[in-house]
């Protein structure tokens, strides 16, 4: 992957995290964000940060994908986040985990790439313990997907 594409993808992930965080903290817990809410949040993010060509589309794809599959993603994360309920996690950590789990399970992104990018987002936006927490949970998810022969977008998370 070229450096420009990597930078664009990294910026897309950052924008998607900001969108997911925004719609997560601005809604009731049981309410799934709509495509319209995601588009509004993405427009707000794009108004404040310059996104390179293609980054906006990938950020939207990630945000919509996480929103549409949030319940399944949250079940998988809950199974792998020992002693942590999803709703009790820090909002940044919760959405970094959702984003990476979606990439591993539905987008065909290799687990190692999704985990590395998620740890970097946690380092940048989370609290001091966030990178280690995110790495541990996602490593467990990746091992489960690998054991099932999944994780390259063929079947998604259960």
Regions found by a protein language model. Give the residues of each.
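N-terminal interaction/assembly modules
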Residues: 1-158
